[in-house]
Amino acid sequence: MQTPSSNPKKNSARRRSADPHARLSARLRHISFGAAVLLVVVAALTVIYSLYKIQIRDGATYRQYAAEQQLLDSTIQATRGEIYDTSGITLASTSVVWTIWADPSYSTALYTTTTDQDTKAETRTIDEAAMKEVCTQITLRLLSGDGESLDSVDTTSAEYQTQYQAVCDALSQNESSYQVLATKVNNAIKLSIEEYVKTYNKAHSKSGTSAGALEKILAKLGLGQQESDDGTPTVRKGRVSVSASKGFQRDYPYGRFAAAVLGFCNADGQGVYGLENSYESTLAGVNGRTITLRNAYGNAIADENATTYAAKDGSNLVLSLDVNIQEVVERYLNEAVAANTVENRGCAIVMNVKTGAILAMASKPDFDPNDPQDFSANLAYLTEQVQAEPELYTIYKKDENGNYLRDENGQKIADAEADYTGTYRDIQWKNKTITELYYPGSVFKVITAAMGVDSGKATYYTTLNCSGAYSVAKQTYHCAGRKAHGAQNLAEALRNSCNIYFVQLGQRVGSSLFYDYFDAFGFTERTGVDLPNETSFMQYYSKSRLGEVELASSAFGQAMAVTPLQVCTAVSAAVNGGYLVTPHVVDKITDQNGNVVQEIGTNIRRQVISESASETIRQIMEFEVGDGTQGGGGNAYVAGYRIGGKSGTSEQLNMDRRADGDYKKVASFAAVLPANDPEILVYVMLDDPNNARTDYSSILAAPVVGNIISEIAPYLGIATDGVDRSGTTVKVPNLTGTEWSNAQVQLNIKGLKHHLAESESDQTAALVTYQYPRAGAEVPYGTTVYLYTDTYEGKHAEVPDVTGKSADFARQMLNAAGFNCTVEGSGTVQSQSEAPGSSVQQGTIVHLICG
């Protein structure tokens, strides 16, 4: 009989089957081990993926986060370049300004804090005395101009009250951490406010202040001590948090001067109009950077290893514009716009016909680039302009989908509550010489004449007949006043401004050739001037559409629309030998040290007509102006100079009618001088003048051109007609009762200068009531006649003492004081006819004896 242990395998199996817990425990150990391995693998994969994500996939982002936490990247502002006139006078510059701001929530000296015992809530109450003290001191400094002249501030003025209230309102926002007190503050005021706040905070520091030190601090602030109930000096604890942020301001020292040319910058210092915009990349420069370590508070740590990338300051613009010429142009243009109640602004250009350099360019009314958003000075004009051009400016109602609302007749409904602020600004910012089209009228006859002469279809002596009416197809053309000029040559036709002659000349040239010349003279493209917003919209008949009627109307300037600057470049080409040049305002670009970086040379685009044809055009234009005694162009004549010119009276582009039913007009005049070898062109245009006397440009625009020439020709040293008039005398005409503009013309023709004693623009249309020297007086050639429109007596002035001065300097002193001058002998002044210090009429001739 076998024992139970005689079969080991069976015994073992019996033991296993008999211990199920052991078997379960073993299985769990295997599962646990597998799970542990799996977890380790998953964890490892997670770590690997995280490392991949941090180091590789998103590494750049995390490195940037780390750098931002550790490094402080500060911008170094580049200094914007300045703009100068041709002689170096600053027209636009950049200055450092400061924004003064406060942190009312941290200005504990201005508030009393109480705590509710139940809710533990804190309540801050303004300390009226402290608030008044701080607001007063800050306001006085803001209005002082220099931070020091506090006593000069009128504390009763509206300006003071407004500024004081603004400061108080800002500091009263006790839960705010940022409140602006003032902007565009100069450095002197900023330093004064900082010193005041520093001293104030020292006096009110929580650490306490000794009585002696407190007395000194309060005395420095100009404040007395307060006393406690026991009579000891006390001061309220706390501080005022006022800081300054640096900024830059673009300054235009002459205000509205050349505003349409210079343009302006926005609040971020970027050029948005005019030269500021077209030369933005040149003027702006490139900002620099400083990269330093920062501490836990985000502040820079002083570190000699800081990395700095220097800013590259902007370059300067030196213009061809001359402030002296620009001043003359703007003065006379302003007078003309006011005197003739010009509804749609006026513009003027003075340009070198050979190089294209623009010496002056103006549009009036305009704006102040120091505050371009302000249109209040032009509001009346702007309102009238918007009302006069409803199809251009009216704002119409729209539904929620942006569709126009219409009335029962299908017409769009005007929005009576619309805001025209943006429209007003856009209008006043426009440079009229390059942004607006107009029919050039008879000024274009110069171009038609050039076409005819250059093509061989006409000469100076080509005679055509004007019977007073001329029909083309079904269209009948007349001359002004329906006058019949009879037989006339090219020069006579230009002087007579004969429409019929030039219609016939246009027919001789023919549509195809006329268009080719029109294109060659630059009327189908931009002039390329270095100013922004030159219109790209051209309104003219293509060669295929230039039919016989269109050709006839185009020949005398009443069918194709152009810009004033296009007219100037075309007329320049007609007289300078036939070369179409690109006009430009910038003469050169310099760096911050004045070194020339780039010069803007003459760009000849092409030769349009021959030199011989150009010579003929110069001759007929000079015939138009003559000696001032014949033809409307004579109103632009200035004695002593050879001047060529042409007037143009055209209908407005939109063919609007005035209240009297006639079409609104545009009056313009273009002159060149010296006529035999032109150097400059002077152009004036008045858009929709409302002169009760006339519409003719020869009466409205030509005198303005003549007045400009009378002052700038001597200044520029323009060659005279060669006649020596020194020592000659001129009889002063009787100008009493004459309109101011006509008085100017008469004096220009005689070689006398003029000065309007009362030069307010609203008086320029008035009659002359008094003149000195008086009518009939024999005076030296070039004498200035003082004209008055508001008095029957001349104004007196004190005669300066010019003895011992050179003759030239003495003349300057006397002219500046309002006197004429004659000189006998040479050397220094030995005696003068009017005693020094005596009071005599302005315009009096002071005779000097030199030796």
Where do the PLM segments sit?
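Acidic/histidine-enriched alpha-helical segments
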Residues: L150-D169, V342-T355, N465-A469, P532-T535, ...
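Extracytoplasmic
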Residues: I76-T79, T86, S93-V97, S176, ...
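Ligand-recognition elements built from short beta-strands and adjacent flexible loops
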Residues: I600, G640, N654, V684-G851
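Soluble non-cytosolic domains of exported or imported proteins
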Residues: A78, T125-K132, T183-N187, G269-Y273, ...
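Beta-lactam-recognizing serine transpeptidase/beta-lactamase-like catalytic domain environment
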Residues: A92, W98, N295-Y309, K354-V443, ...
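Periplasmic/cell-envelope proteins involved in peptidoglycan metabolism and beta-lactam response
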Residues: M1-I413, L437, S512-D519, V638-A639, ...
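Sec-exported extracytoplasmic/periplasmic mature domains
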Residues: T139-E148, K198, N266, A284, ...
